[in-house]
Amino acid sequence: MSEEMEPKLLNTTMSRRGFVAMSGAAGLAAFLAACGGSSSDSSSSGGDAAADGVTAEEAAAGKSFDPATEPGGPIEIFTWAGYDDSPEEGLPAMWEQYIKGEYESASPLKWTFLEDDQQALAKVASGYNPDIIHPCIAYTQQWKDAGLIQPLDLNLLPDFGGIPDAIKAGGIIDGAPYHMPFDVGFSCLTYDADQISFDKVGGKESWEVLLDDTYKGKMALFSDDVAIIKIGHLINKGAVDPNKMTQEEIDAAKETALKIKPNLRNYWTSQTDTVNDFVNGNLIATYTWPDGYWKIKNHPKMKDRNIKYMQPTQGRLAWVCGMVLSANTKQPGRASLAMAAANTPAAAAALTDDFQYASGQQQGVAELIKNKELIKAFQIDDPAAWAPPNAWFEAPLPNYKDYVAAGEEVKAA
């Protein structure tokens, strides 16, 4: 990491999905090809959506909006903390195209922050009405079934075709596009290798270390009900898909999670808080997204410390998140233009350089990324790092409520 980037990195409050330069990199491209995905040509200059890497069926199934006829007023974005406009950090990058456009004065952007996918869905279902929401793609069907989102107008999203099919597939429902993938990455433990030993769990990096009471009070996990249960399942079953659990397996994973709980300092809701806990000596292992690992590793207090991002034998958790359009927005066209700004190659590259974040957007991004070190740091040139059993991407869960109920029981115990 360059000296110029370090202050910006360490000062940022970004507390969401920190991944890296996957956009356009050879390793990810190979992985997507193996999954049947592709990366089609697109540009942010607009034009026929179908000609820009979007199928005619997708374009036809979407909506059609006219920004010029909309009433104005703030466009509210319900997103993860840190994804707002931060001019003091020089970081309005993901919204810059909209902010410099013709509608910003009449329809300025406004941000509110969610805690996790379950909380966001519950809040909007209870009557909160933002214009844009930032859920993970595995939850798209639930948002649609609840009547909370509507199809996208791909003519207002000219770079949508630059998102490979394998990434956007989960957001296409009944042929219509509902979800614009934005950020992609891993979830795993960041740990101090000088203080954590895996000798009691077979000598290799493993989620089982959470059961080792040697580190009681010095470890932490994210307060996400589904993730808590998936980790328990990976400990119980090894490298087995945690998206396909029976009720018996959920119950067993809950029991394992209950055994982990006494060893934890907390279940965190803000990654910024757990990063601070770590660098201040309160933790030696915590669940983070890649940006959390990068912040800890490069913090001045961690100088000469052997900070690692775990690659457990059971596999990392992984995710695709992005933006959906509220069914109740009065400005769907202008909200779509804000989404389009976040989907440009320039915005994707800036997220990588400034926050170690990558985008679902693949086209023309790699050459725009300045810090090539990030590609190596997060195995972007290694397709195997993204495939099972090394990584388990989120997927729709038919028994989602059972996962959540079990996770809630663990936290309440």
Please name every model-derived segment.
Residues 150-161, 179, 303-317, 326-329:
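Short beta-strand->loop
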Residues 321, 325-387:
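Mature extracytoplasmic/periplasmic domains
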Residues 276, 382-413:
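Conserved C-terminal helix/tail region of periplasmic/extracytoplasmic solute-binding proteins
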Residues 36-46:
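Bacterial lipoprotein signal-peptidase II cleavage site
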Residues 66, 122, 129-135, 150-190, ...:
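A structural signal for short loop-to-beta-strand junctions that line the ligand-binding cleft
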Residues 59-142:
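Early extracytoplasmic/lumenal segment of secretory-pathway proteins
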Residues 140-142, 220-232, 241-308:
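Ligand-binding pocket segment of bilobal, Venus flytrap-like solute-binding proteins
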Residues 1-14, 25-33:
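N-terminal secretory signal peptides
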